[in-house]
């Protein structure tokens, strides 16, 4: 008896479909590749990696065949594959082939024209994939695309078949199985179809019960929050509170505390519905704020080291001016920050970690890097990676530097939406619940040996200082391409990010949906944007980095670093921890939070590159990526 043949791998199919010895296109292999791509759970990410390698082949015929496979898959493989192609990771590989900086000078015109034709067709046919449109527009700005190519008639994307309106039949696998069973004439198949229909109806009933439970829970939370807020504010304004009112406030407070785990369970059950998650997390934010408000104003307790009513709506003075902690630990291997003029720069690690995204996709709308004003460790137009273990140059050195003429803001703007598919909002649940322990809370009155102005004083003095847009520019390690103007008034030392620390409990989240920065191996990192700006520093965006784990193993030695172009500045405050326990669905999960400050005086479009290292089990991971889904800089003062 012959052994059963093992199914072919995607790699074997792509090798056969793009074989340079093929006399013509092997449509059987191409279609087989597309079909298996759809069937495999990890098909789309693996397929894009294989295709990127084949497209960069020095043999024209092999590259053309690979592009044909890519085009066929885009037309027949659906949204999962579209999402992978629409990521900068894959688009960057296509840009390499057409860019003269990389492989463009060695690539035939036929291959380059085919790539540009595909990019343009996807821009027209898939408008929801905004990153593809961004990449294509960047190529036009760089002059690589002179004019839009003329598309053949068969290039237009066919409209996808409408999904069944009945939610019960939205599970494609079960729908196909049900259709097959119903077509059968065997009694066993008909009984199986009947059983399957009952299961699908029961699943739909459970789904409706979850929706009803979620709606009722959110409504109850909102009502309790509204009532408790009104009573606490009335109490804080000197209103005479009767004993019954105090009892009612206490009862509402206890009810709000009991709703916290309920909201978390709802968020865990609503992972695939972004709008529902946003409602749950907004309700949780409101719940946390009113609980802290009650503790501060009614009980007079300190909330994470802050006895002031920093959560009162409308208060903008809760962000204290705290000096940073930042001394590099012994043995650190991360790139050091740029040094002051006259000091010896520490050797930097090889620049292999800076990928083509720095020059291409991460530099959309930016001109070539401008020469730095002092010795720089990074020649790519980017600041070195910053972490909470790195420190900025001392502020007095900055005060001696003359202000430089700021160049005009870039004309590019952030896309209106980068797609809810890139968002995972679960971590925001723990934004207010996972604050740093008191041992890591920095208090300005205990830390600073010498007097230092607070941000409230800075706000009062802002009229006598130079405007933020011009004075903050001199904090950046860059100069304008034009000759500097004569020295002007020195930059106030308190404008340095080194002297600013924002307590996590004083941050109020904005209505902007969080951005998923990293989501692999059961480890998620999200960016939450603060609602209120720093007093006197509308050029600074406050971001809360939230890290949480659904991995079955504990995660240790977590280090998150960030870097921005030299026209900006970034600072990471110490994280609330460096370890996350193994996920337990019964126990309330913990999270790590870290405050990130981003200065952007010239209001350029933000492009942030991150480096993440962590250990899971016996394996150490070193991850890098980029984030560009930031609010437009013009809106930072009123998010």
From Swiss-Prot:
Effect of residue 197 to A: Abolishes interaction with ARF1, UBC and TSG101
Result for mutant: residue 200 to A: Abolishes interaction with ARF1
Assigned GO CC terms: cytosol; early endosome; early endosome membrane; endosome membrane; Golgi apparatus; intracellular membrane-bounded organelle; membrane; nucleoplasm
Membrane association type: Peripheral membrane protein
Name of the featured protein: ADP-ribosylation factor-binding protein GGA1
Domain (GAT): residue spans on this chain: 171-299
Tissue: Ubiquitously expressed.
Effect on the protein upon substituting residue 358 to A: Increased interaction with IGF2R
GO molecular function, one term: ubiquitin binding
Modified residues (N-acetylmethionine): 1
Polar residues bias spans: 381-390
Domain observations: The VHS domain functions as a recognition module for sorting signals composed of an acidic cluster followed by two leucines (DXXLL motif). The GAT domain is responsible for interaction with ARF-GTP, UBC and RABEP1. Required for recruitment to the TGN it prevents ARF-GTP hydrolysis.
Consequence the record notes for mutating residue 284 to S: Abolishes interaction with RABEP1
Residues covered by region (Unstructured hinge): 300-509
Mutation effect (residue 239 to S): In a breast cancer sample; somatic mutation
Subunit structure, as described in the record: Monomer. Interacts with GGA2 and GGA3. Binds to clathrin and activated ARFs, including ARF1, ARF5 and ARF6. Interacts with RABEP1. Interacts with RABGEF1. Interacts with the type-I membrane proteins LRP3, M6PR/CD-MPR and IGF2R/CI-MPR. Interacts (via N-terminal VHS domain) with SORL1/sorLA and SORT1 (via C-terminal cytosolic domain). Interacts with EPN4. Interacts with CCDC91. Interacts with HEATR5B/p200a. Interacts with SYNRG/gamma-synergin. Interacts (via GAE doamin) with NECAP1 and NECAP2. Interacts (via GAE domain) with AFTPH/aftiphilin. Interacts with TSG101 and UBC. Interacts with RNF11.
Modified residues (Phosphoserine): 185, 355, 418
Residue ranges of domain VHS in the record: 17-147
């Amino acid at each position: 008896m012959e052994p059963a043949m093992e199914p072919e791998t995607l790699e074997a199919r792509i090798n056969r479909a793009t074989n340079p010895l093929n006399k013509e296109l092997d449509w059987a292999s191409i279609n087989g590749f597309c079909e298996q791509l759809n069937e495999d759970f990890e098909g789309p990410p693996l397929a894009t990696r294989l295709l990127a390698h084949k497209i960069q082949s020095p043999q024209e015929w092999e590259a053309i065949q690979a592009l044909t496979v890519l085009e066929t898959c885009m037309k027949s493989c659906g949204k999962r594959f579209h999402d992978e192609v629409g990521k900068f990771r894959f688009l960057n590989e296509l840009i390499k082939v057409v860019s003269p900086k990389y492989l463009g000078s060695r690539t035939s015109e036929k291959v380059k024209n085919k790539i540009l034709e595909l990019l343009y067709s996807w821009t027209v046919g898939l408008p929801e994939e905004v990153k593809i449109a961004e990449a294509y527009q960047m190529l036009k700005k760089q002059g690589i695309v002179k004019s839009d190519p003329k598309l053949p008639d068969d290039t237009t994307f066919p409209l996808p078949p409408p999904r069944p309106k009945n939610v019960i039949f939205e599970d494609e696998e079960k729908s196909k199985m049900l259709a097959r069973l119903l077509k059968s004439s065997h009694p066993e198949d008909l009984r199986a179809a009947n059983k399957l229909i009952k299961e699908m109806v029961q699943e739909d009933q459970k789904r409706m019960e979850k929706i009803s439970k979620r709606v009722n829970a959110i409504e109850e939370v909102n009502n309790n929050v509204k009532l408790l807020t009104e009573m606490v504010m009335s109490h804080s304004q000197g209103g005479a509170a009767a004993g019954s009112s105090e009892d009612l406030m206490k009862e509402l407070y206890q009810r709000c505390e009991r709703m916290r785990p309920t909201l978390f369970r709802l968020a865990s059950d609503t992972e695939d519905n972004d709008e529902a998650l946003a409602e749950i997390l907004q309700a949780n934010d409101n719940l946390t704020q009113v609980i802290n408000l009650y503790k501060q104003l009614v009980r007079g307790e300190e909330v994470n080291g802050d006895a002031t009513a920093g959560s009162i709506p409308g208060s903008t003075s809760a962000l204290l001016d705290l000096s940073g902690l930042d001394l590099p630990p012994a043995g650190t291997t991360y790139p050091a920050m740029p040094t002051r003029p006259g000091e010896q720069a520490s050797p930097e690690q090889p620049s292999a970690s800076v990928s083509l995204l720095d020059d291409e996709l991460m530099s959309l709308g930016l001109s070539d890097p401008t020469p730095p004003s002092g010795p720089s460790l990074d020649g790519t137009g980017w600041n070195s990676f910053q972490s909470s273990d790195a420190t900025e140059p001392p502020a007095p050195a900055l005060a001696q530097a003359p202000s430089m003429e700021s160049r005009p803001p870039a004309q590019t703007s952030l896309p209106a939406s980068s797609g809810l598919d890139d968002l995972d909002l679960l971590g925001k649940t723990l934004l207010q619940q996972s604050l740093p322990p008191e041992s890591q809370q920095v208090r300005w009155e205990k830390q600073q040996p010498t007097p230092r102005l607070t941000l409230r004083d800075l706000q009062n003095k802002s009229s006598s200082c130079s405007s933020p847009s011009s004075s903050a520019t001199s904090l950046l390690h860059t100069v304008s391409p034009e000759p500097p103007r004569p020295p002007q008034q020195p930059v106030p030392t308190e404008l340095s990010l080194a002297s600013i620390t924002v307590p996590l409990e004083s941050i109020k989240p904005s209505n902007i949906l969080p951005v998923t920065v990293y989501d692999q191996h059961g480890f998620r990192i999200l960016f939450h944007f603060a609602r209120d700006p720093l007093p006197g520093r509308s050029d600074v965006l406050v971001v809360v980095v939230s890290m949480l784990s659904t991995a079955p193993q504990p995660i240790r030695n977590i280090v998150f670093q960030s870097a921005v172009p030299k026209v900006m500045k970034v600072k990471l405050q110490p994280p609330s921890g460096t370890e996350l326990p193994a996920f337990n669905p019964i126990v309330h999960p913990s999270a790590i939070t870290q405050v990130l400050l981003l200065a952007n005086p010239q209001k350029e479009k933000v492009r942030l590159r991150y480096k993440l290292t962590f250990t899971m089990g016996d394996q150490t991971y070193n991850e890098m990526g980029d984030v560009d889904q930031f609010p437009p800089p013009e809106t930072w003062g009123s998010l």
